[in-house]
Amino acid sequence: DKDGNKKDSFEPGIELNGKITVFAEGCRGHLGKELIKKFNLDEGKDPQQYGIGFKEIWEITEDKHEEGMVIHTAGWPLDNSTYGGSFVYHAENKQIFLGYVIGLDYKNPYLSPFDEFQRFKTHPTIKKIIDGGKRISYGARALIEGGFQSLPKMYMPGALLIGCDAGTLNMPKIKGSHTAMKSGMIAAETIMENLKENKSLSSYEDKFKKSWIYKELYAARNVKPSFSW
């Protein structure tokens, strides 16, 4: 009840025990952010940054469909002081993935990210693509955008952070599935070495820094900060 007393319908939560736990909750995971705070994993790092992304799947007319076509834009309808951009991916079966991302550090308190996305679709280039088409799916999600400068320490006693729990999204590409999967593979290798040879979990971060993920995020490190200069 409201006072914390167990009611007749109370059922205790499931207790999961493991020697090593991998946290892969995605952007701003509830447990991940608690662990980062508890173990001070972000000490000496830039504050993490976030955005909100909208995505729609459209079925368009055959004459406008160009399978494999990719469009990325920055700016309009946002002003020069607000970070954001769009993507249009022409998939198969006359479908496109259309989306817009806006950084949640925007200064205008009256800005509505959803409304800006709707306004974006009135741009002549985009309107021409979706005219006569049909929206068949839509959604929204938070994105982690701090990038290289905000990567926390990724290991702690008995646990590892992977994917967006660790902030591995490549912000300019608006892409994080590939880095999440690779970080999971590195975590698996680290766990096997720990269980077989009792190696320290700190080797996870060493392996991460030697991988292509680290190089990719380093190459993109100045894109997001450049919008604040």
Predicted segments — roles?
Residues G29-L31, D105-K107, G147-S150, T168-N170, ...:
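Flexible loop/turn segments at secondary-structure boundaries
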Residues G167-K173, M185, E189-W229:
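Active-site-proximal substrate-binding core of FAD-dependent oxidoreductases
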Residues H72-G84, G139-P152:
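Conserved alpha/beta core surface patches that mediate binding of polyanionic ligands
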Residues D1-K128, I186, T190:
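Predominantly flavin-linked oxidoreductase catalytic cores and closely associated redox partners
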Residues K128-G139, K196-S203:
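Flexible, glycine/charged-enriched surface loops at secondary-structure junctions
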Residues E56-T61, Y138-A142, D206-K215:
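Short, conserved secondary-structure transition motifs
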Residues A140-M171, S202:
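FAD-binding beta-loop-beta segment adjacent to the flavin cofactor pocket
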Residues K45, N108, S150-K153, M171-T179, ...:
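Alpha-helix capping and helix-loop boundary segments enriched in small/acidic/polar residues
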